């Protein structure tokens, strides 16, 4: 296992334009999730919702390296991955509201957003189910020979699923261009890591499959971006799979409505005060003198307007009708 420490923000590795793009992505995810928290609480949104707020640095830090030809498989907590991969937030909002014009025409909902045109193979309500899917996508990419990669995300709990471990072995044996990302927020629903696994770090398992593994501070965008860049480059060059663990925090419960009685007193207050990846990123780029606070404030206002527009579009969109019942049932591609 290789542990990677947080990077000194005094020497930022990205130019100003890229930093502003990254901030916009992270802010869009945060505001998107915060608005869902409010609207779900009002009863406006059907089904279940699992929010990515607090984890933005990992999704954006990793997926910033990808293009539309690269494939990803997400999780039940997948809104952040979708936005980071380039899926339209308006189409996503319609999907979550269960409306026509959504990314899956309102039939998938929060846990099953997909957009193949962006390489987003889909979020998945089944824990660990993205791993075998991305192995198939990575095998196809290997045959095409264009240097494309696949990335699958899962939580710390899902990494104990048999499908995940079997996929690690398959990817290693076939030398597939795939990166397995464990987003370790410390809880498998309400079960802490200590109750779910005996290893000190999830990447300790990588050696057993003959692949490299790296652990990073998932609240530090720059640490995630650097580590992800290395394993993605390795995969593009034919070096095979890697395991990347991002130690991170989530601002809300496992699902909306989770009472979070498993958390220690004051834990959430500490997380929001000291481990907010968006604040940490903003502080790093402004203290380095690369970006002015006013520029970030402008992005904040623009993103707020985008999210409000997305919500209004979703509310105004029609529901799927009886004529839609048998469409999208089968797929052939």
From Swiss-Prot:
Tetramer of 2 alpha and 2 beta subunits. This is Acetoin:2,6-dichlorophenolindophenol oxidoreductase subunit alpha. It is an enzyme of class 1 (oxidoreductase). Pathway: Ketone degradation; acetoin degradation. Catalyzes the 2,6-dichlorophenolindophenol-dependent cleavage of acetoin into acetate and acetaldehyde, in vitro. The alpha subunit is probably the catalytic subunit of the enzyme. One of its GO terms (biological process) is pyruvate decarboxylation to acetyl-CoA. The keyword Glycoprotein does not apply. Its EC number is 1.1.1.-. The keyword Oxidoreductase applies. GO terms for molecular function: pyruvate dehydrogenase (acetyl-transferring) activity. Keywords: Acetoin catabolism, Oxidoreductase, Thiamine pyrophosphate. Its cofactor is thiamine diphosphate. Gene3D superfamilies: 3.40.50.970. InterPro entries: DH_E1, PDH_E1_Alpha_Subunit, THDP-binding.
């Amino acid at each position: 296992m290789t542990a990677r420490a947080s990077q000194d923000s005094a020497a930022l590795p990205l130019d100003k334009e890229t930093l502003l793009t990254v901030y916009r992505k992270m802010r869009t995810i945060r505001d998107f999730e915060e608005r869902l928290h409010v609207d779900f609480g009002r009863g406006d949104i059907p089904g279940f919702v699992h929010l990515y707020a607090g984890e933005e640095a990992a999704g954006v830090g990793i997926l910033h390296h990808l293009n539309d030809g690269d494939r990803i498989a997400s999780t039940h907590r997948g809104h952040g991955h979708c936005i980071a991969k380039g899926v339209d937030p308006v189409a996503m909002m319609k999907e979550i509201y269960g409306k026509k014009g959504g990314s899956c025409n309102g039939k998938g909902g929060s846990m099953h957003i997909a957009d193949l045109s962006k390489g987003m193979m889909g979020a998945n309500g089944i824990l660990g189910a993205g791993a075998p899917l991305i192995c198939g996508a990575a095998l196809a990419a290997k045959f095409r020979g264009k240097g494309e990669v696949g990335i699958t995300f899962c939580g710390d709990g899902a990494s104990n699923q048999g499908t995940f471990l079997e996929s690690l072995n398959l990817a290693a044996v076939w030398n597939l261009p795939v990166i397995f990302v464990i987003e370790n927020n410390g809880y498998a629903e309400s079960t802490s890591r200590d109750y779910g696994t005996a290893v000190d770090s999830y990447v300790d398992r990588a050696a057993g499959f003959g692949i490299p593994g790296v652990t990073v501070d998932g609240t530090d965008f720059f640490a995630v971006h650097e580590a992800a860049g290395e394993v993605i480059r390795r995969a593009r060059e034919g070096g095979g799979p890697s395991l990347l663990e991002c130690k991170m925090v989530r601002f809300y419960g496992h699902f909306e409505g989770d009472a979070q009685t498993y958390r220690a007193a004051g834990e959430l207050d500490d997380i929001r005060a000291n481990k907010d990846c968006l604040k940490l990123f903003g502080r790093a780029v402004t203290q380095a003198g690369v970006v002015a606070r006013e520029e970030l404030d402008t992005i904040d206002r623009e993103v707020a307007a985008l999210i409000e527009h997305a919500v209004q579009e979703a509310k105004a969109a029609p529901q799927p009708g009886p004529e839609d019942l048998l469409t999208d049932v089968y797929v052939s591609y």
